[in-house]
Every structure is written in C-alpha cells, then in structure tokens.
Amino acid sequence: MFSSVAHLARANPFNAPHLQLVHDVSGPRSPPGPPRRSRHLAAAAVEGYSCEFGSMKYYALCGFGGVLSCGLTHTAVVPLDLVKCRMQVDPQKYKGIFNGFSITLKEDGVRGLAKGWAPTLIGYSMQGLCKFGFYEVFKALYSNILGEENTYLWRTSLYLAASASAEFFADIALAPMEAAKVRIQTQPGYANTLREAVPKMYKEEGLNAFYKGVAPVWMRQIPYTMMKFACFERTVEALYKFVVPKPRSECTKAEQLVVTFVAGYIAGVFCAIVSHPADSVVSVLNKEKGSTASQVLQRLGFRGVWKGLFARIIMIGTLTALQWFIYDSVKVYFRLPRPPPPEMPESLKKKLGLTE
C-alpha cells in the first residue's frame, strides 16, 4: 500500500514545479511517461535534496516535523491552555485571562500552571505525527486522482479534503491524552500527574473515559485543521503573488520561513474562531461524568460556547504560526523537497487561451 502511495506521490501535480526547474528549453521536449521520474531525480540532485519527493523517508521526516511542531508548541502554552479550560468549565470563578492566572497562582503556585504538560506533550506529538504526515500522503493521493488540471482548479477543496482525512486519524491518537489532560487541569484533587490520572480514569469508566470525547474532538479539530491547512496554503500563495516583491525561487531560506510564519499566524486566527465552540464542549464534557455533547451544548448556550475566545485566538494564532515555522524549518534542515505554490499547468493555459 505504502509503496503504491509513494509511486503516486512522485507523479502528482504538486510535484510539477520541481520538474520544471531542470527543463532544458533549448532542447527537444521530453516524451511523457517514465522519463518524468528521472527528471525529478535530476532535480533532487541539483537541489541537494536528502530524499525523493513522495518516498517513505520523505513522509517519515514530514511526520517527525509534525511531532516537533505540535508537541513542543502545545506544551509551551500549557499555562494559557490551563486557564482557558478553567474559564470554560467554571466561568463564575475564572472571569478572565488575568483573573484566571491570578487565582491559579494563588491556589496552586507557579508549578500549578504546568499541570497537564505530560499528556499534552505525548498527545499532541502523536497528533502532529499523523496530522502532517498523513496530510502529505492524502494531498498526493487526491491530486493524483484529480489529475494535473483539476488539482490546480480545485486546489482549495483538495487542501480541505486532505487535511480533514489526516485529522480524522490524528484525533484518534490524541483523544486519550486530551481526556487525561482536561481531568488533571480542571478537577482539583483528581490527579496531579498522568500516571495517577490514567489508572483512575480506566477504573472509573473503562476505555470509554479515553474516547467518549473523540466525537467532540473531531468537531473541534477537523474544522480547525481544514482551516489551518487550506488557509495557510492559499495565504502563502497570495503573499508570494501580491506582497513579496520577488519570486519565491529568488528568496533566501530565511525569507521563505518569514513568509511561512506570517501565513501561519493569519491561518491561526481563523482556526481559533472556527474551532472554539467545540473546544468549549470538549472541556466541559471531559470534566463531567455521564454528560453528552448535546447536553453540554444546550446548557452552555450561544454565549457560553464563546467564553475564552480571546485567549484562544492569542494561543492558537501564535501556536499555528510556530507550528508551520518549525515544520518548514525541519524540511529545510533535512533538505526535503519543498514545492513552491502551484502554478497553472501549460495545458490549462492553452485551454483558457492564456498562452501566446
């Protein structure tokens, strides 16, 4: 299965810009078919890539980039996440960000702000592995199904479909640790560490304790990830087209990473807004026993599900920007192929009468 996916990825339309880098315009046009792959290998050699686009090594390193980008960033903002969760589950006590920090410091001390760091690190590292690794796989797979012209015309829909598919599996890996994290952060005296929380949760509710929140996590994370990837991809495309004063190929690696960070932050703001209501439901659901998502949603009401939005915008905006920056930096460090924003295929230009 994986070998067939790798084969499809090597020939997918997103890879076309790299093939054009080594095209000799003075010579005769190469025939279609097998030579395409050899041209790509030549491009990889010219660029000094460590692996071939679409190879198993490529996907593995993309997954590793996801581990670092999600695991490290989510762990770094645990204090803000803790206060946000407490505002969602007990708005009468925690009335705002600064008030929440003040009460937490007074009751739990500085160490209390780090509650839930272990399940956060483990859970989001596993999620990042699946999210970024599978996104690259599904993007290549779906683009091959659509073909070169349709991939360009429907690229936003492709980004949405690939990211939703990847996040579906990523959340199955995340859900158990997310449930433990919320228990540790929002139920005083329940458990102080992951080692205390997991056995206690299993004893009380069995496996259901770890996966009862997976549907709300899907509700929160799938729209979030769809927005995160699609908005990022199109923002990068727009920045290079309308803002950056020179082509991407002429930008240094550092300049490209700055564009990545800016596009990531813009995407993060939209992500926070789209996913916040479901995030509020998840926080309350994992705190309470026996409640369902619909019951929690009905009880919170419209205003209740938007509690803590400002904190989430700050957190998710910064988080998303850093995640894309780290992920792209990993690609640069390991010398992975980094295709530029997609360009309209020549065949489509001819159909639309855009060629001379």
Swiss-Prot record:
Domain of life: Eukaryota
Transit peptide residue numbers: 1-44
Residue list for modification Phosphotyrosine: 190
GO cellular component: mitochondrial inner membrane
Alphabetical list of PROSITE patterns matching this protein: SOLCAR (PS50920)
Ranges occupied by Solcar repeats: 57-141, 154-238, 255-333
Stated name of the protein: Solute carrier family 25 member 3
Upper taxonomic lineage: Eukaryota, Metazoa, Chordata, Craniata, Vertebrata
